[in-house]
Every structure is written in C-alpha cells, then in structure tokens.
UniProtKB/Swiss-Prot annotation:
Gene (UniProt): dcm
Protein name: DNA-cytosine methyltransferase
One example GO MF annotation: DNA (cytosine-5-)-methyltransferase activity
CDD domains: Cyt_C5_DNA_methylase
Top-rank EC class of the record's enzyme: transferase
InterPro entries (UniProt xref): C5-Methyltransferase, C5_DNA_meth_AS, C5_MeTfrase, C5_meth_CS, DNA_meth_N, SAM-dependent_MTases_sf
UniProt catalytic activity: a 2'-deoxycytidine in DNA + S-adenosyl-L-methionine = a 5-methyl-2'-deoxycytidine in DNA + S-adenosyl-L-homocysteine + H(+)
The species this protein was found in: Escherichia coli (strain K12)
C-alpha cells in the first residue's frame, strides 16, 4: 500500500512539475529560469541541464521541494474571488491585459484571450491567471473568425466562433484603428448579398470583433481605441463602426454626444499624471433593455480625490543607461530649438518631478527609440545650457527617460513604490507594450460604472436558463 501511494505521488509530482515548467517557458527564457533556480541555492543548474531535463521529461527528478515552491511563485495567482466569479468576459486584442484588470477587479472571470504579439503574450501570462479548465488562449483571432479564409459563409464562421469562444456576458476589445474600404461592394451586391457590416468592414480587425459579437451576442461590450478614431479617414471609419454596432442590435452609450466634451473620450490624466485620451464605446444589447440612463459622464465620480504625483511614481535612483547620452541630448535639444524658431511645438517633453502638477505627454509605443516624449528633469540648468551646452557640471544633470518599471506605474499597472507587475521581456519590448496599453484605472472606473448593469445581465441570463430547464 505504501509503495502504491509513493508511485502515485511521484507521478503526480512529475506531471505537476513538467506542466509548471511548460507554463514558465511560455513566459520566461531558459536563462531566467536557470538564474531563478540557482538563486534557491540547493542544486547547480545550467541551461544545458535544464534543457536536457525538459527534453527527457525528467526535470522533476532534479527539482527539490524548495525549488519547486519557488518556481510556483513565478506564476500568477488566481484572483481573490476564485473560483466564485460574478460574470464571464473575453479579452480581445488584449495586449498585456490593461482592460482585463478592471473587470477582474469587480469579480469577473476571463474565459478567452486573444493576442497575436508573442512578447505581449509573455507579459500577459506572467501577470494574469488563466484557469486551464475554463480559459482559452488564442493568438491570431482570424483563426477563430475565419475572416482570412475565402469562401467561408457567415453561418459557418459563426458556428466556428461558438465552438471556440465560450459564452460570456461582456466582450472587451482594444482593436487597432484601420481604414474601411468600400472596394468590392458592387461585386457583393451583384451577388445578391446585403450591403452591411460584412461589406463595409471586411478585411479589418474590427470585422473580427463584429463577427464575434454577432455569433455570441454578449449582453454588453467595451471597445477601446485612440481618440483620433473619430476623425480617422475624415470621420468615415467612426461612422461605419457606429452604424455597424447599431445594425448588430446594440445601443452605444452617449452615441449622440459628439461635441467637444464627448464623454466617450476619457483622459487618463484624471487618474494618473499622464495626458492620454482614448475613446471608449460601451454597448448594450438592445433586446435586454440594459442601457437605460447609463452614461460615461458619471466616470467623474470615480476620479481619485488626490491624484498621485509624478514624483511618487519615480524611483529615487536608476541605472545610468536610462540617462540620455550627451550626443542624444544635444540632438533633441537642438531639434526642439529649431522647431521653436519655426513657431511649432515639435520637440521633447520635459517634465519636472518637483512640480506636483506635472503631467506627462502620452507614452507611445515608440518610446524605446529616444524617450523624447517624456524626459525626466534631473536639474538641467536651461540658462547655462543656452550659454554653453557642453558645460561639464550641467552635463551631469542631463535628463533621463522613464524606466519600464516607472512606465508600469504611469499606466496604472502597479501602485507607487511597488514592483509587483512582472516584466519578463526586454526594455524595448516593455516600452512598446506599455505604450500600446491603456491607463488601467480608467477601465477599472468603467468596470465599476458597469457593475450594476452586469449584475442585471447575469440575472437575466440565469432566469432565461432556469426558464429553459423548466420548459423541458
């Protein structure tokens, strides 16, 4: 009896260790895992040893209990409410999960994620728990919607979507901004096909979002995009999007409010010291009568009473590599002076941590190139720089760029002074990821506003399911 238990325990341990290592290798490279294992100090590990052990399914033989426990800490933990979730949602064009965090914070369960960028996937999996029993991870959303395959009918595509994407109450998507072309419309009309979203949006990633909404009919959706979506292609892109969502049978909050203070456009500066405007489209399924008086104007109720300052987000000491080189600083300085003389505002964006009202420009995906849009002042004397740019003493105070960790805080992925958000990628990839992401507390606020509506939608779904069981 003792022998049987021992064999079973060893088999279970082996399976668990192998599965854990496979998950970790989706996030971290072998070099990082070797460093983590050697940090425990119980065995000597090398890249060759780990690779050989993985290839032979024998890594668990070498892993000590302490090493196993340490590696487990490198994986994200389930949310506090696991496994008692209030509703289900999916996360499309997920990036590193900025929108997801807000909806998870109100009790939601993510049941499907789609993200094509392999580096973003690593960061996503490092920070977000994905229940293997209920969560599906996809890379190219077109493999689900079949939009890249010719000759697939809408009915066949819808069935394929239903097979691969679980039922959900809320759809989240930060879809890319692309122009819509009407090329091919006359051909489709000549074939007797109705002119609608399948025509106008074909070939764009928004079309994939539309196909999923149409196939799965979630109670609501939250779509995010850059502010310029409204003016993109002389307004045609936004007009087609709104018409399409209406055709699908959804009411978008504040749809008619398109003035200069459009509530659909939310600036991250209300939550964190970064000017970052994004358009947020919140849609409600018309037949469920959920929208009522919902408006994003109420988001002001969620603004923090005291916004954190830029200084609170910064580390007191950073590595020298984040300080601009003399050559780069001279180039940016002269570039700005040249454009100032021409009367335009092109140039770097210096921010001063000593000023509690400082707000940065928008962090972009190109920040890794030179960091010009957000430079942190380190005491550079402008008057001295005008007289003698190369003054040795002043050169010691050249500005610096943000570190990836500081970018995580500026985007709201972690609080001031924290280092909880895992960044398993290079600085270049991290800058791209944060620059492509959203201000997390903005969408936490949107989720909070939607919480009563989501509860209402879940109650309707449960009533419908109960009624269906009774009628059988």
């Amino acid at each position: 009896m003792q022998e049987n238990i021992s064999v079973t325990d060893s088999y279970s341990t082996g399976n668990a260790a192998q599965a854990m290592l496979e998950k970790l290798l989706q996030i971290y490279d072998v070099k990082t895992l070797v460093a983590q294992l050697n940090g425990v100090g119980e065995n000597h590990w090398s890249a060759a040893i780990l690779k050989r052990a993985l290839a032979n399914d024998s890594a668990w033989h070498r892993l000590s209990e302490k090493e196993f426990a340490h590696l487990q800490t490198l994986l994200p933990k389930p949310p506090a409410h696991h496994p008692h979730y209030a509703f289900r949602f999916i996360d499309l064009f997920a990036g590193i999960g900025g929108i997801r965090r807000g909806f998870e914070s109100i009790g939601g369960q993510c049941v499907f994620t789609s993200e094509w960028n392999k580096h973003a996937v690593r960061t996503y999996k490092a920070n977000h728990y994905c229940d293997p029993a209920t969560h599906h991870f996809n890379e190219d959303i077109r493999d689900i919607t079949l939009s890249h395959k010719e000759g697939v009918s809408d009915e066949a595509a819808a069935e394929h979507i239903r097979q691969h994407i679980p039922e959900h109450d809320v759809l989240l998507a930060g879809f890319p901004c692309q122009p819509f072309s009407l090329a091919g419309v006359s051909k489709k009309n000549s074939l007797g096909r109705a002119h609608g979203f399948a025509c106008d949006t074909q070939g764009t990633l928004f079309f994939d979002v539309v196909r999923i909404i149409d196939a799965r009919r979630p109670a609501m959706f939250v779509l995010e995009n850059v502010k310029n979506l409204k003016s993109h292609d002389q307004g045609k892109t936004f007009r087609i999007i709104m018409q399409t969502l209406d055709e699908l049978g959804y009411d978008v909050a504040d749809a008619e409010d398109n003035g200069p203070d459009d509530p659909k456009i939310i600036d991250g500066k209300h939550f964190l010291p970064q000017h970052r405007e994004r358009i947020v489209l919140v849609g409600f399924r018309r037949d469920l009568n959920l929208k009522a008086d919902f408006t994003l104007r109420d988001i002001s109720e969620c603004f923090p009473a005291q916004r954190v300052t830029l200084a609170q987000l910064l580390d007191p000491m950073v590595e020298a590599k984040y300080i601009l080189t003399p050559v780069l600083w001279k180039y940016l300085y002269r570039y700005a002076k040249k454009h100032q003389a021409r009367g335009n505002g092109f140039g770097y964006g210096m921010v001063y941590p000593n000023n509690p009202q400082s707000v940065t420009r928008t962090l972009s995906a190109r920040y890794y190139k030179d960091g010009a849009e957000i430079l942190i002042d380190r005491g550079w004397d402008m008057a001295t720089g005008e007289k003698d740019f190369d003054d040795p003493l002043n050169q010691q105070h050249r500005p610096r760029r943000l570190t990836p960790r500081e970018c995580a805080r500026l985007m709201g992925f972690e609080a001031p002074g924290e280092a909880k958000f895992r960044i398993p990628v290079s600085d270049t990839q991290a800058y791209r990821q944060f620059g492509n992401s959203v201000v997390v507390p903005v969408f936490a606020a949107v989720a909070k506003l939607l919480e009563p509506k989501i509860k209402q939608a879940v109650a309707l779904r449960q009533q419908e399911a109960q009624h269906g069981r009774r009628s059988r």
